Amino acid sequence: MEDIMKLDEDESSYSNPKKILSLPFPYPGQKKPIDRFVINDDGFFNFMGRKEFKNVLTTINKFRSGTGYMKLFVYGTVGYGKSHILSAIACFLFQTERRVVYIPDCRQLSVDPVDYVKSALFLAYHNDDAKINEINSCENFEDITNFCKSQFKEQLYFIVDQMNALDENDDTGVNLDIKKQIRRDLDKMANNHYYIMSSSANNKTMLHLMHKQTGELKIKLFGGFDEEEMKEWWNSHNPDLPEMDEQQKKQTEDITGRIPLFLKFLLESNHENFEDALEYLNQQLTLKIKYPLTSFSNIISESNRWEFHVSLMSSFLTNNFPILGHGPYDYDHRFFYIEDDKCYYVCGLVRNCMADYLYEKGRMEIFVDVKWIKLFKNNPSVKGFIVEKACLASICRSGIIVNKITFKVNDYQFFSSAEDINFSLSEATCTFYLPRKWNQKSIDGLLALYKTNTLYIAPIQVTFDKEGHSDSEASFFSGIWPELKPNIPNNLNIEVIFIWITRKNGIDEEVEKKFKKLRSRNVEINPDYTSVVTGFANVNRDIDRYV
């Protein structure tokens, strides 16, 4: 407590992104939330000033016992920094001589509720030996509740974080009845005192409160850093990061959504160049986001709300207006939010994961829609992802004509490796094979058409700049092709057409078969094939119009 009392008394310091404050973590117990806080050996953590600190503190200062509001719900999307703001609030309230009962982690609270709360109470009454003795004598939660009830002459400030851990849908491994009991105990304990609760926006209780007029104040914290906060984050951490130009910084801001929790992974990477750091960042964010995101959608896919969900996801992906008739349970509030009647995703990785999910579900109509195609106009760093999805979805729906061959897609399948590709030899059947991983190194897709004893195989690469692109033809013929060729009957006529889809039509080129001599045998480098360069307009005129 001595360290807390030495903190800056100026509340504006906590709202100023130029300030990096070293704060003592305001919970004395052993089980601190080290998954969310980097706490050093002296018990301190760093807090970059956040503008929303002022909003939260101002709201708390409006509390009035008996004649006004006494409860505040703080909720929001994943990784905003709610927990750091609340811990800083706890420090400031302590510093201004208010008694704070700070409970930072309801997951840990549920393991041993009595000891966990007693630790918080010890700090609240650090300067009152008589009260410390009373707290020490509490043997169960009823004793704690009675103690708090008896403190009617002095208002306590209860700050309870991570309340989603007590939600019935949160998999904490704690019995549902125990969760309900803890919720009841917390409510009784904080009754007649000031009560600040925080949770992710997906919490069932929060979803109820968000859409009801209740007797509590509410603060929503969506997204990540604003422009000024992001600028100061770069200034503070530039020495610890690989060198980046402005475009690469914009790319990083897009993929992370400027979310503090996600930006933290960039600091962990320890990579010396941007490409490796970005790859690590993508890997870590995918691990954190993809499973919970798709699990939520999978549950809805089995209900009668699936079409609502798909339409709503399309609105989120394209930052459009929400559809009429949607409900609070039709989308995942951790990753998506609606503000001023407009739909938003929290970060680019969420957008990409949801786009890939709906793409694999066959909802190609989303990606040929002009609202999707126009997306990259406001965000050039994602134009490759947007246009690739639009091109491939357009081919799925309308086909493509190249080298006088019409590829009208009958079926599409997703592949992780060449082993997943099994060519159909049914007459006039065209199958479109699509890689599960976006930005697959060799190709973006592969068409296979069997017609009049000929198997037409057409690998596809989508790019804005063919000249600056890696040699996908060489990569395909050295990587995937040797694995595909043994699956093709020897007596079958094969025609290979490598399709480049880019800004403008180019000149078709007939490429002859090449070999390299290896000891006593010749090894094929590539078969005879045709290299075709076709413009976006031949796939979808809207793509060409908005590029």
Segments (PLM) and residue ranges:
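N-terminal pre-P-loop "Q-motif" helix
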Residues: 25-32, 39-63
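Conserved NTP-binding/hydrolysis module of P-loop NTPases
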Residues: 109-135
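Conserved P-loop NTPase "ATPase switch" module shared by AAA+ and STAND
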Residues: 127-179, 194, 463-468
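Sensor-1/coupling segment of RecA-like P-loop NTPase cores
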Residues: 160, 164-212, 218-222
